[in-house]
């Protein structure tokens, strides 16, 4: 079926002064898109693909970064990605920022069954014990790690394995998630 990806807030280079080493902001983004292609990844940019197995079909939607937080620009166009998916009974959305779920997905796109997100990194700091998880990121993001459910929709927020700022983690382990659809 392949590997699919979307862009997150840092991928656009909005936080630095351009040009850098003679490369423009737009060229940097194009270079990043090419890296995805060179790795064999299909970068979904406000679009969808249909995955098929055993005569079953799933619509996989991927949008550019969309955030409900004021600091992050909205590049994502959910309407474009969603167009043409109405006939598919199961839809998965890849959207980098989990704030997108409550702000738009659950209110305007009730037919999205599962949203896959990241962005928070669990703030790379927290406490996880059986039945208890805490991180200061929860004061900024209600959905910051793990599975969340609302009505007939689900959101999974992956804490990732990278970092932002401090190059380490305390109490919040890196994560690679495997989700099996049956």
Outline where the language-model segments fall.
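Soluble catalytic domains of enzymes that build or remodel membrane lipids, polysaccharides, and related
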Residues: 1-182
């Amino acid at each position: 079926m392949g590997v699919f990806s979307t862009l997150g807030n840092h991928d656009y280079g909005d936080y630095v002064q351009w040009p850098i080493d003679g490369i423009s902001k737009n060229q940097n983004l194009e270079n990043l898109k090419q890296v995805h292609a060179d790795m064999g990844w299909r970068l979904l940019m406000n679009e969808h693909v249909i995955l098929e197995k055993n005569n079953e079909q799933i619509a996989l939607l991927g949008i550019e970064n969309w955030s409900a937080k004021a600091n992050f620009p909205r590049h994502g166009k959910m309407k474009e990605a969603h167009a043409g998916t109405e006939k598919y009974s199961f839809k998965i959305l890849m959207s980098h920022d989990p704030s997108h779920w409550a702000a738009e997905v659950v209110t305007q796109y009730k037919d999205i069954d599962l949203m896959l997100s990241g962005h928070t990194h669990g703030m790379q700091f927290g406490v996880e014990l059986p039945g208890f998880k805490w991180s200061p990121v929860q004061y900024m993001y209600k959905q910051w790690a793990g599975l969340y459910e609302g009505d007939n929709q689900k959101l999974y927020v992956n804490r990732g394995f990278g970092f932002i700022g401090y190059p380490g983690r305390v109490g919040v382990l890196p994560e690679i998630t495997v989700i099996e659809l049956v």
